[in-house]
Amino acid sequence: MKRNIVVLASAVVLVGAFIIAMLVLVDRDTGNVESTAKMNASSLVRDHSPKAGNGDARVTIVEFFDPACGTCRVFHPIVKDILRDSPGKVKLVVRYLPLHPGSEDVVKILDAARLQGKFWETLEAAYATQGKWAINHQAHPQLFWRSISSVGLDPEEVSRDMQSPVVMHNVQQDIDDAKALGVNKTPGFFVNGKPLIEFGQMQLLQLVNEALEREYGG
């Protein structure tokens, strides 16, 4: 009986030690992600980055996204609601991170649309029709182009701008910045430079609310 108690006690100690070790590792990983973001803060926003909301808002959400990403599509209205619910206090900056096969050409179309002043309309159309052009985790640029025909983009300008040094540089810059910030999946969120470590809708809302509290008070 005593032996069983000793064995059980030893097992409990081992499990406890394992849990403590895992918590330490999680804290260390969280610290690494946050320090990486802080050291590379200049990589969060670029001049070409599309922006929505009040330019003077003191809370900034930066989102790295892939238009072929289903989770990005789900979170898009959530982020729009955040801006709507805190008018003038929160702005959104989006960055390209084409991880799905074929997505790089799609984000080039989006950036070409930005040059025509129709980025947000094109993004809305992209998400609304995602199931038609993003199939089995692969983006199909030709199908994408057909899906956004209602936006009214000039196709010749888009075709030319997609291959322009400006658009190619913008897309590559975003990819490089994502790497520098440790973003390897989409959507990747930062709120006032602080990365969203534990992914989820409630976690994002909490991060935004904390920033609102710091910047604007209760």
Features from the language model and the residues they span:
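Conserved strand-loop elements at the edges of beta-sheets that form or border functional pockets
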Residues: N54, E63, E198
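A short beta-strand-turn-helix
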Residues: A41-V59, R84
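A generic local structural motif
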Residues: R46-P50, I78-K80, I175-D177
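C-terminal cap of thioredoxin/glutaredoxin-like
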Residues: M1-V24, R146-G218
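Structural alpha/beta surface segment adjacent to cysteine/selenocysteine redox centers
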Residues: A57, V62-A68, R73-S149, D154, ...
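Functionally engaged cysteine thiol sites
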Residues: E34-A37, A112, D161
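Ser/Thr/Pro/Gly-rich low-complexity linker/stalk segments immediately outside membranes or between
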Residues: V26-N40
